[in-house]
Structure formats: C-alpha cells, structure tokens
Amino acid sequence: MSYLKDRDRGLILHTDVGIGYETPWRQVEALLLTAASRTSGLGDKPAPFVNIKSLGDFAVVYELNAPGGDPLTLGRQYTALHQNVLDVFNEHGVQIMTPAYEGDPPEPKIVKREDWYLAPAESKNP
C-alpha cells in the first residue's frame, strides 16, 4: 500500500494484484474499476485508472489507482477497497495469484459467494 499526494489532485490510493496470464487484461482492468466504483468514500477526480505494473514470471501485476477521500480515514478506505477487490474477483471466478505462485491448482482458489459469511462472520447484504 502506498499513497501519493499532489496539491491539485489530492490523495491517490494504490493497490497491486497479480493475475495469471490466462485472464485477459481487459477483464482485469474492468474488475478493478468495478471494485473502485463499489468503494464508498473515494473521490471521483481523477477517475480511477489501472496500470500494468509488470510482466512477471507467472503473473501480470496490475496497479489500481483511485482518488482518496478524507485522509483521516485512509486505513478504512484501503480496507473497503481491498474487500471490494476480493469480492469482485471472486464473483467472476478470477484467482488473485500474489504474493506467491506455486502452480495451477485443480480448482481456482476463489471464495464462492455462498461461503462469504461462514461462521463466525456476520451475514450482511451482499
């Protein structure tokens, strides 16, 4: 996690995800932007954007950049953004590969929607 502050632009939140080469980059970009759009408390200028940060040995590293809101709630903004990234990727069956990749599992490593609130998690409106 890192952030950048520019007097004219405000706070920009950054987060990285590594996704396998079998997932189209256009899909990954759309998923990350969807996660940003679901995150309350973020600003809208500049519009969220995605960079392809690196082409690794086993995964492409994408960087989501989104305008932050109140600097005093930075931790909550990152938490909400990361929760939405996890949910959106799970909803679409896309496995996040980082921080380490050891091989292709027989089944994708995602959390199915019906398992999002297993005990002791409290049920919330999905």
Regions found by a protein language model. Give the residues of each.
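Solvent-exposed, non-transmembrane regulatory segments of membrane-associated proteins
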Residues: 1-6, 11, 16-23, 33, ...
